[in-house]
Structure formats: structure tokens, C-alpha cells
Amino acid sequence: LRDAQALQGLIQRGVEAFGGVDILINSAALFQRAGLLETTETIWDDQFAVNLKAPFFLAQAFARALPPDRRGHIINLADWRALRPGAAYVAYYLTKAGLVALTQSLALALGPQVQVNAIAPGAILPPPGGDEYFKKVAARIPARRVGSPEEIVKAALYLLDSDFVTGEVLLVTGGEHL
């Protein structure tokens, strides 16, 4: 996901395999705990390459490959912390805030042919060994539970079904963002 040419090739393989691509979901992400003082250049570069550079160049390749008579959708998986960052994952939060800005810029640049939106999940899948932490998270959010991958799928299906939603960030947090 670091090589813009390889990303172009991914879209091209999709076009060749399926006769075209009209949906792009950017969901790959690196999530590495590193505060301001712990963030190295390598952590910074890795986070930005996967979380922001790849979605940009995939969207560019997608837009170039989409025939002018077809409509398309791009959905970027952001994070609710893009809108309310903390201190523990500085580079990650910055990349997800950048992904929200990219979502809105792409909606302006590619509309009306392509609708571009983001989903900003809250607590969905615990990190390895994070089950106890997720229990604490669930206790403090209004839904009193963490989400499931199926809820992200439902949000994506809503965005794909809509023909009037673009440039939006759909929070799927159970109220964790409040």
C-alpha cells in the first residue's frame, strides 16, 4: 500500500476481473500507540503511507478508471477520534483527520459522479489482549456495549444505497464520541 503505481495496479486488476469497479472502500489501517514523544519518523511514515497516502492514490486510480457514464462510491474508514483526538496515538489520529478532509475534498472534486463518504467507528474490535479494556469502554458509552463489524457493514450499505449523501462522516460509535 506504499507504492502509488502498485495501487493503480490494484484498481486496474479489479477493472479487468469484473469489467469495471464502481465501489472503493478504503479500510486498511495501521493503529500504533505512540504519543508525541514516542512517535518516530518510521512510525509517522508508516501511518501516513497506509492510512492516508494509500486512500488518496486508490481514489485517484478509481476516479480515472470509472467510465463517465457510471456512478461510483468511495467509502473511507476513518475513526471518531479524527474529530476528537487524544494524545496516545498522535500519528494515527492525524492520519484519520486527514482522511476526513480527503473525504470532503474528494466529494467536491468527484461529485456528482462519485459519492464520497467516511464511516468513523468507535470501539468495534478489541486489539489483541484488549477485552478487559473494551469492557470498561462499554460501561462508559451510552449504548453500554461496543459495536460489531456488522454495524459497520450496515453503515456502508446505507451510504451505498443513498444517492444524496456525500462528503459526510457517519459516526458509528454507540455514543462514545459524546
Which ranges hold each PLM region?
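Alpha-helical segment proximal to the catalytic Tyr-Lys
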Residues: 64, 108-112
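Substrate-binding pocket helix/loop in short-chain dehydrogenase/reductase
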Residues: 35-36, 43-48, 129, 137
